């Protein structure tokens, strides 16, 4: 492997420097170059190129398991351990996210709180039976941008979203309106969120009631009651927003849109649905 590294990088640094740094002889390296390459070596190079393409297509966010499922989808026969080995050789590692918190300037309205009807049952037998919702924040040079989303637990597809400079009832209402517009009039639908004032507001509760949607809310201070929604926002931040600096809110809006509609929904592999993307899962279920 040291000789392969030297061969790959000798166009950048002299081979004798690399040999010295890695503790191998120049004679051994040049003898290795003259040897015919093994079938395994050629195969590793071909698979390694495909692995790198998958990793870069995910904007450097995929770990070995998701890359592996990309390879299987392309018809490449290889095991997970081989993917891990070839990713290590190329130093392909998903980047961790940074964390920054906005001040709590949300609306404060006294309203009835719904029981936790969902009760951590994060699976749905059909679409438009269980929607989960929440909002998060993205830092820009102009200030915070708040992002609300609605996810269908059947396919993990983001069916509604909205973005605003303020975390108001209108923010979460707009996300639900988009979901209803996109999926059609709901029937026997459960909507789950936390107990934030935006979701307990009269405006939002009236929208649920007008469409006959059953309201469910997490218990106070219990993030695990909406863990699937937390998982989506963690992916959004880890895979996109936390690694970037946005000059304007419009720039952030465009990037969040790109992540949701051009990557997450149509392409991102999700472990909960057999490493398919949400839209691919819906296609296989005959919904798209």
Q: In which residue ranges do the predicted regions lie?
A:
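Charged DNA-binding/catalytic regions of mobile-element recombinases
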Residues: 1-288
